[in-house]
Amino acid sequence: PEPVQPTIVETLRAAAEPLPALDDTEFAAAFDRFGGARVVLLGEASHGTSEFYRARAAITRRLIERHGFTMVAVEADWPDAAAIDRHVRHLQHEPMRTPPFTRFPTWMWRNRDVDAFVNFLRRHNGERPQAERTGFYGLDLYNMTASIAAVLAYLDSVDPEAAAIARRRYGCLEPFSREPAAYGREALTKGYAMCEEPVMQSLMDMLRKQLDYVRHDGDRFFDATQNARLIADAERYYRIMYYGAHHSWNLRDNHMFDTLQRLMAWGGKDSKVVVWAHNSHIGDARYTDMGTCLLYTSDAADDLLC
């Protein structure tokens, strides 16, 4: 007779490992085994669920305090997370037109659990020199309007002539600032990428002048170029979203993975990152219909734990 195959429940029960309660100090200690990884991916089954957020915060705090993790990268828009990063690393405040994380869904990041973690990061960093402080970064591409404002503010301060040119180029997207998806419909109707060339030219101009700009402030240049990359990818994202979910989903995941790679390169060989994102982004998607994910697109999977 053929051997009896275990049920899904039996398989899960055999693999599952009991954990202490979230508030128990031993809960986070159970994850010390991952302290040697360079990237730890912490998922969630649903956005805004307190238990997931508290668990990730406890694990991340342990990895930062005991194992030297230097970055927290989350499924959030770059310019919004950058405002939090400046706060937790005690950097100069650069006001946004609107407060961070006010774009739907606000409850995803504007909640008590995230606030408590942000307060921990600020206290933790306040006791350390600038080079040893842990940063907070966004991997996602949705807040195109805030990224445009950030790029223009940066160029206004270092290269007013380039700022004027970029302002004209980004003006192509201005009619769609309140509803970016409308740009995709417009581009689809007209049959061409109306704003692709202007936004790519702005990014390329910044990269060509990298040596000049970095002399002013390397961190601010990195932030500005990340915003410029977000604008370029968001333009493409909203343009192709009407061609099918797979195309836009994979573009978004590729953007997040590329951002993660740039963060790690910018942070240096000793940088260690904790990633917070939905399971659909950081799980292994090889056997799903989505095709790519942060883990699957990596060519350095040995450094990843999720």
Positions of the model-derived regions?
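Long, well-ordered early-domain segments
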Residues: 75-76, 85, 93-142, 146-147
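Alpha/beta-hydrolase fold catalytic core
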Residues: 218-271, 280
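Conserved small/polar residues in nucleotide/adenosyl-binding loops
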Residues: 296-303
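Long, well-ordered, tryptophan-enriched scaffold segments
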Residues: 113-116, 127-137, 142-244
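N- or domain-start disorder-to-order transition segments that initiate the globular core
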Residues: 2-40
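An N-terminal structural lobe/cap that precedes and organizes the functional/catalytic core
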Residues: 24-71, 79-85
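Flexible loop/turn segments at secondary-structure boundaries
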Residues: 47-50, 79-82, 143-146, 280-285, ...
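Beta-strand elements within well-structured catalytic alpha/beta cores of enzymes
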Residues: 37-43, 70-73, 121, 137, ...
